[in-house]
């Protein structure tokens, strides 16, 4: 018996799933979303092929960080210029751009290569409960 390996041209029907982030812990939500984006929930999962589905995360502003992470956890970026380090704690980040905090958590759990970049393009994060993807007929994800 041979192990099944999916080929990129075999992946036809990708589904769209909606994850509601309201009241969910950021890391647990990110792990579940990354699992769907990679395709690990499917029986035809192949590590070197993008077999995953599309993920829409709504209510990103209502995601929860446990403990003192809201105050202590930092979002760090650098412009590339001397003295260009920008540091912001998650409390301020969640007030200004909560969709960025959720997106960074999910993308950080994907492979850090070209395959992971393609998977990240299937992720859509929205601050509130509305999203413009009704035409794709997304299904709610219940595994959380």
From Swiss-Prot:
InterPro entries: Ribosomal_uL13, Ribosomal_uL13_bac-type, Ribosomal_uL13_sf. NCBIfam families: rplM_bact. Keywords: Ribonucleoprotein, Ribosomal protein. This is Large ribosomal subunit protein uL13. GO terms for cellular component: cytosolic large ribosomal subunit. Coiled coil: none annotated. One of its GO terms (molecular function) is structural constituent of ribosome. GO terms for biological process: negative regulation of translation; translation. The keyword Ribosomal protein applies. The keyword Metal-binding does not apply. It comes from the Bacteria. Belongs to the universal ribosomal protein uL13 family.
């Amino acid at each position: 018996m041979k192990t099944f390996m999916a080929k990129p041209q075999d992946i036809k029907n990708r589904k769209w799933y909606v994850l509601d982030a309201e009241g969910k812990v950021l890391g647990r939500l990110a792990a579940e979303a990354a699992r769907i984006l990679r395709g690990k929930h499917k029986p035809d999962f192949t590590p070197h092929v993008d077999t995953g589905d599309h993920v829409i995360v709504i209510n990103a502003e209502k995601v929860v960080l446990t403990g003192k992470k809201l105050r202590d956890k930092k979002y760090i970026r650098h412009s590339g210029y001397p003295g260009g380090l920008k540091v912001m704690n998650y409390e301020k980040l969640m007030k200004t751009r909560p969709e960025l905090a959720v997106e960074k958590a999910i993308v950080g759990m994907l492979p850090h290569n070209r395959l992971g970049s393609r998977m990240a393009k299937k992720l859509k994060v929205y601050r509130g409960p509305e999203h413009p993807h009704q035409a794709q007929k997304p299904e709610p994800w219940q595994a959380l």
